[in-house]
């Protein structure tokens, strides 16, 4: 059996370098106000996450077969530290992007399942504690982001409620204005109708009076003649 660690490590290192470049470009664009798509960066992160799984499996194989590969405790410790640092850096990049890590963030430090955890050195325990603290901090950042999002949604909902209330008041005012205008129009139409009728009656009376005067004048002329 060949030691698979260094081949997978080389792939992980190259992929991490690519992720760093894409991440720096993404952050520079976002800081300048340009919302550029990050599809390529997301793909690179997903690919690196899969490679990290293979790398952790390679570490486990190495620890279970350390004598076969001729590995001492210092080499195994170095491999575990490399994986932990790479894992932490990747999770930090994802959190700064505002996205959830590609793989669920565990609250337990990275360890290998070979029954040898009881024999870890103090330095290994320190690395594990540091990794666990990093994970707790990442979870706090994620929770803060969730709380901020919920607060923003509540604020927007309250603002929308106020705007809807104002619009309802405006509609009520408009309805009242329309009703008042209609009432004034009805009164005006009634007055105009009454005036028209009165004017018509007055003109008829004048015509009758004129006709009577003309008839009287004709009668007088007939009698005189």
UniProtKB/Swiss-Prot annotation:
Residues exposed to the Cytoplasmic side: 1-204
PROSITE patterns: T_SNARE
Record's GO cellular component terms: endomembrane system; endoplasmic reticulum; endosome membrane; Golgi apparatus; Golgi membrane; SNARE complex
Annotated GO biological process: Golgi vesicle transport; intracellular protein transport; vesicle docking; vesicle fusion
Membrane topology: Single-pass type IV membrane protein
A GO MF label: SNARE binding
InterPro entries: SNARE, Syntaxin-6/10/61_N, T_SNARE_dom, Tlg1p-like_N
Span of domain t-SNARE coiled-coil homology: 133-195
SUPFAM superfamilies: SNARE fusion complex, t-snare proteins
Coiled coil: 38-68
Intrachain disulfide bonds: none
Protein keywords: Coiled coil, Endosome, Golgi apparatus, Membrane, Protein transport, Transmembrane, Transmembrane helix, Transport
Cellular compartment(s): Golgi apparatus, trans-Golgi network membrane; Endosome membrane
Keyword Ion transport: no
Bilayer-crossing regions: 205-225
UniProt keyword Transmembrane, yes or no: yes
Annotated CDD domains: SNARE_NTD_Tlg1p-like, SNARE_Syntaxin6
Family, similarity comment: Belongs to the syntaxin family.
Name of this chain's protein: t-SNARE affecting a late Golgi compartment protein 1
Phylogenetic lineage: Eukaryota, Fungi, Dikarya, Ascomycota, Taphrinomycotina
């Amino acid at each position: 059996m060949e030691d698979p660690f260094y081949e997978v490590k080389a792939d992980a290192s190259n992929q991490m370098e690519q992720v760093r470049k894409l991440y720096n470009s993404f952050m520079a664009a976002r800081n300048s106000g340009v919302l550029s798509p990050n599809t390529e960066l997301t793909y690179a992160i997903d690919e690196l996450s899969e490679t990290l799984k293979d790398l952790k499996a390679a570490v486990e194989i190495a620890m279970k077969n350390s004598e076969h590969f001729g590995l001492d405790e210092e080499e195994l410790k170095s491999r575990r530290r490399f994986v932990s640092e790479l894992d932490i850096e990747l999770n930090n990049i994802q959190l700064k992007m505002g996205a959830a890590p590609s793989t669920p963030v565990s609250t337990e430090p990275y360890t290998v399942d070979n029954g040898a955890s009881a024999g870890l050195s103090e330095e290994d325990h320190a690395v594990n504690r540091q990794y666990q603290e990093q994970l707790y901090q990442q979870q706090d950042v994620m929770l803060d982001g969730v709380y901020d999002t919920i607060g923003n949604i509540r604020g927007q909902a309250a603002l929308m409620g106020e705007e809807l209330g104002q619009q309802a008041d405006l509609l009520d005012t408009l309805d009242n204005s329309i009703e008042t205008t209609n009432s004034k129009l009805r009164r005006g139409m009634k007055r105009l109708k009454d005036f028209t009728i009165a004017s018509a009656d007055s003109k008829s009376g004048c015509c009758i009076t004129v006709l009577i005067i003309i008839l009287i004048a004709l009668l007088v002329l007939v009698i005189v003649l």
